[in-house]
């Protein structure tokens, strides 16, 4: 990994068994698979109140502890519905975690609303929900001695600056790599922008690095030989989703990150420096063009698009 540690931020790594998670009220957007699922299970088993949003609920053994909200997060219309849904207690949340993500396909894929699929799932779903709920996040919590916290998983700190003028990958020759790196830069920009935009919450970036999940299926194919070999190698050389989840659950409970909004954290939980190329002008461009793309998608919404897809 290519990030650099941030020496100004440190936190005590307590034994996870010594932490009281019962006061936590957490929503995980993308919590039905991969990292999000691992984090939601870890929290639910430790008595946190947990809500997950995604396509398919797989944790029947914890159905009494995890509130599942079904949604197709590739659609702007669905993300708008989720951001205003009474099924998710945004006003009572202590933590909001975004883990939704795929990899861009070798051939450009578009949603029914005209958006490149990776950008729609891996970034715009977060942008929409986050911006819609940020100002009311946690306002009805019974205990208000710290700020509500938002964690955005991506690949921050690796120097990706992307191209905010081609968010939909339709202005230049298509490249799966360039498209996915655009989502990486956009997500890091979302964290950087939120630091000053939303002073009522703390916002952080997460860089899990390589972990065996199904995130690469859209690129490599589901259960293909290449996919199986790739995930096998990753499983032997990198940490598991469950191991990472324990680190992150310990991190989000640490009082040391209070008022450290804008900080990024590595796969080991170390604070890392943001990408130097994401200047104020670049970040602002990402935010401006994100809003324009959302508006375009809403105009393109198919009359046959259903919230039950």
Swiss-Prot record:
Q: How does it sit in the membrane?
A: Single-pass membrane protein
Q: Where is the protein found, in the record's own terms?
A: Membrane
SUPFAM superfamilies membership: NAD(P)-binding Rossmann-fold domains
Q: Mind listing the GO biological process terms from this record?
A: response to furfural
Source species, domain of life: Eukaryota
Q: Does the keyword Zinc-finger apply?
A: no
A GO CC term attached to the entry: membrane
Q: What is this protein called?
A: Uncharacterized oxidoreductase YKL107W
């Amino acid at each position: 990994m290519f990030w650099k540690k941030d020496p100004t931020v440190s936190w005590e790594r307590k034994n996870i068994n010594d932490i009281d998670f019962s006061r936590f009220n957490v929503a995980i957007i993308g919590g039905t698979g991969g990292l999000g699922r691992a984090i939601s299970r870890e929290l639910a088993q430790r008595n946190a109140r947990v809500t997950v949003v995604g396509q398919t609920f797989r944790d029947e053994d914890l159905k009494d502890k995890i509130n599942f909200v079904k949604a197709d997060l590739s659609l702007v219309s669905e993300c708008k519905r989720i951001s205003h849904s009474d099924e998710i207690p945004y006003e009572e949340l202590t933590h909001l975690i975004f883990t939704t993500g795929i990899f861009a396909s070798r051939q450009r894929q578009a949603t029914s609303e005209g958006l490149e699929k990776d950008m729609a799932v891996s970034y715009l779903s977060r942008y929409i929900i986050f911006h819609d709920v940020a100002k009311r996040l946690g306002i009805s919590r019974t205990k208000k001695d710290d700020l509500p916290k938002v964690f955005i998983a991506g690949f921050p700190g690796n120097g990706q600056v992307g191209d905010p003028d081609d968010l939909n990958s339709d202005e230049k020759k298509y490249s799966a790599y360039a498209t996915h790196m655009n989502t990486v830069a956009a997500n890091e920009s979302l964290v950087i922008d939120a630091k000053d935009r939303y002073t009522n919450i703390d916002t952080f970036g997460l860089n899990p690095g390589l972990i065996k999940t199904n995130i690469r299926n859209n690129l490599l194919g589901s259960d293909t030989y290449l996919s199986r070999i790739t995930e096998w190698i990753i499983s032997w050389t990198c940490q598991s989703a469950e191991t990472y989840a324990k680190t992150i659950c310990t991190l989000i409970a640490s009082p040391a990150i209070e008022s450290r909004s804008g900080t990024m954290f590595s796969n080991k939980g170390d604070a890392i420096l943001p990408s130097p190329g994401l200047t104020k002008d670049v970040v602002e461009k990402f935010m401006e063009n994100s809003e324009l793309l959302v508006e375009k998608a809403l105009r393109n919404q198919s009359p046959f698009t259903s919230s039950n897809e």
